[in-house]
Amino acid sequence: MSGKPAKKTNMKIQSLKMTLVFVLTFFIANSVLSDENKPIRLAVAGMSHGHISFILGRPAKGDFELVGVFDTSRVLTQNVKVRYGLAPEIIYHNLEKMLDEVKPEAVVAFGSIFDHLMVVEACAPRGIHVMVEKPLAVSMEHAKRMAELAEKHQIFLLTDYETSWYPTTAQSLKMVHKDGFVGKL
């Protein structure tokens, strides 16, 4: 049996994953923008998680503008910069500096789970929406603090779950929003 059908299926799944991550992650955040066609100003906090390729390796669709990439590791940022052809001016080694200079509307956290709280602590007071990889936090204490910050500063705090990529999730989203399956939202 050749590996071609499996490879083709994996490529389709990867493509679906990338699309659905953005549909589900930024649907709400995008709806609060005054101009629905305006791309979201997106920054990345942390680069050690493998899902970073869903952002940096994704073909441009005009739905977001990558305005900054942060990680404390200079080796990792150099490798990622070279691999994805990132402009050096969007690379930062200080999260607060990046947030203040590039003013993203949303941040995706692709670093250590131990850094999720730090990212929310930096973003929430600035009114920046955050998506973290699963799990949300390393402890209930961190999770509660993140929830408090999100509520206090009225930001969206999302966790990226693999079910986001399931075809049934995309169909459900279509049924809810395009077909009015549950009424007007």
Segments and roles (model prediction):
Residues 19-29:
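Bacterial N-terminal signal peptides
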Residues 32-85:
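N-terminal Rossmann-like dinucleotide-binding module
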Residues 44, 132, 157-159:
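Hydrophobic residues in well-ordered beta-strands that form the structural core
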Residues 137-185:
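A contiguous active-site-proximal alpha/beta segment in oxidoreductase catalytic domains
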